[in-house]
Design a protein with these regions (language model features):
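Conserved acidic donor-binding segment of nucleotide-sugar-dependent glycosyltransferases
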Residues: 306-307, 311-318, 327-332
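Acidic donor-binding loop of glycosyltransferase active sites
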Residues: 265-277, 290
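Short His-centered aromatic/hydrophobic patch
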Residues: 76, 97-103, 122
Length: 364
């Protein structure tokens, strides 16, 4: 049997420590696509936690933890720079960052590795001038949707440097964890209905809307429990507000969950209260037939066809968010119709070929 050719190019992917849904799943798929295309793949995680780094390491990828805290800090940036320089990346090689916080880190790498191609993938529209400044120093910006591309243009990123490539709907396989086992592990009642939201605990996720909706749903539906998966600087504020609104017994918050692929297939609904790439768990949930409800955002409009695969609700009045969730939970036929349509739509709108397009774009 002939020996496999040695990889001729190296890609360093830079991301937060994530779980295998949303952007985390996209990173797993991208790593596999680069390896299949003959690239040597290194992945650097700039925050602690998350199951994706361990999953990538188990799959044979060179995985590097450059952080010990749940947020990107100066120490992680310094370690990332040192590690990136140790790879001696040259002209054929590439750096691919995932998300806006990582795009800002990339600005520190640009002057130190000027010969490597720098690409930044964004799943949510950039908002601030600092991010725009960093993106303008990249060779390529991979926008996950037309709305993201427009946001880049608003920050004066040249159109010639922006390519729009939608995410790929290819959920991580379940590991065979049963509902009863999940209930024991997560402290849930197996006989209740479960909902799932995956979001960073940051202001843009607008999690106060989620808490208000949980509070309102508790009045009309007593057999509901809610799982929120996310880490970030808003955690203490969120938990304090949950206690004030007396929803703590129904809300289960975890910074990370390695069992998300199994949990995703057991929930009654996935929902999202703010602007989160891939809708958090919405894209993956729709691909396995879970109805979705989200407050209007660029990601929601990309993932959900309102009235066909789930519901998109306005931010005001606030009552619309829990009302639409309740309507699906109480109508099995409606939920089944949304589930079937969601699976068909994600297969057509977010095909597996997207990762090949990503590799080609990064390669130049």
């Amino acid at each position: 049997m002939p020996a496999m050719p040695q990889p001729s190019r190296t890609v360093l992917m830079v991301s937060r420590g994530l779980d295998p849904v949303g952007t985390g799943r996209q990173i797993e798929l991208a790593a596999a696509a680069f390896r299949d295309a003959g690239w040597r793949v290194h992945v650097a995680a700039t925050t602690a936690g998350g199951a994706v780094p361990e999953r990538l390491a188990a799959a044979g990828f060179a995985m590097h933890r450059v952080a010990t805290r749940p947020v990107v800090d100066a120490a992680a940036a310094v370690r990332l720079v040192r590690f990136a320089r140790s790879l001696r990346l040259e002209g054929p090689d590439a750096i691919l960052t995932w998300g806006r916080s990582q795009a800002r880190l990339a600005a520190a790498l640009r002057p130190l590795l000027p010969r490597a191609r720098l690409a930044c993938q964004l799943g949510s529209p950039p908002r601030d001038r600092l991010t725009g400044w960093c993106l303008r120093r990249a060779d390529l910006v991979v926008a996950g949707s037309p709305a993201v591309a427009r946001g880049c243009g608003d920050l004066h990123v040249a159109d010639t440097r922006v390519v729009t490539i939608p995410p790929t709907a290819d959920p991580a396989a379940a590991a065979g964890v049963t509902r009863a086992e999940l209930a024991v592990r997560l402290g849930l009642d197996p006989d209740t209905l479960w909902t799932l939201c995956v979001a960073p605990l940051e202001a843009e996720a607008r999690l106060e809307r989620l808490l208000w909706a949980i509070d309102q749903l508790g009045v009309v539906h007593r057999r509901l429990e809610h799982v929120l998966v996310g880490a970030g600087p808003q955690r203490q504020r969120l938990m304090r507000r949950a206690r004030m609104q007396q929803v703590g017994e129904r809300l289960h918050v975890f910074p990370h969950l390695d069992c998300l692929p199994d949990l995703l297939r057991q929930v009654a609904i996935v929902w999202q209260s703010g602007e989160v790439a891939c809708g958090g768990a919405i894209l993956d949930g729709q691909a396995v037939g879970i109805p979705a409800v989200a407050v209007d955002s660029a990601a929601a409009r990309q993932c959900i066809v309102d009235g066909e695969t789930g519901r998109i609700v306005p931010a005001d009045p606030e009552s619309e968010f829990p009302r639409r969730v309740f309507g699906i939970l109480e109508d099995d036929a409606l939920a089944a119709r949304y589930a079937t349509a969601a699976q068909h739509r994600t297969a057509a709108a977010f095909p597996a070929g997207g990762m090949a397009a990503l590799v080609a774009a990064v390669a130049g």
